[in-house]
């Protein structure tokens, strides 16, 4: 998983259960949910994700970097505040 977090340092140290929650709360399309979970939770390679969703690996990388992660980060303050309050 270290490779994934070098790409997205803001997500470093986020546990899998919280990453799943971020993906769901971001209200992504089904294809984007599959891309996000495959890369950010399961650390799959871009080529494997692309084969699963019918895109090439550079398109998957671009989608993750420009649309999916920014959308997830837009719900981050709400989620992180709720998680802190629950502790």
Give the ranges of each region predicted by the language model.
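Helix-turn-helix DNA-binding helix
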Residues: 35, 60-61
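Short, Lys/Arg-enriched C-terminal cap helix and immediately downstream tail that follows
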Residues: 68-84
């Amino acid at each position: 998983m270290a490779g994934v977090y070098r790409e997205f340092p803001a997500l470093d140290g986020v546990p899998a259960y919280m990453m799943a929650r971020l993906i769901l709360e971001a209200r992504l399309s089904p294809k984007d949910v599959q891309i996000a979970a495959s890369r950010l939770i399961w650390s799959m390679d871009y080529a494997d994700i692309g084969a699963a969703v019918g895109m090439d690996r550079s398109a998957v990388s671009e989608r993750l970097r420009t649309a999916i992660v920014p959308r997830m980060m837009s719900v981050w303050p709400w989620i992180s505040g709720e998680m802190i309050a629950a502790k």
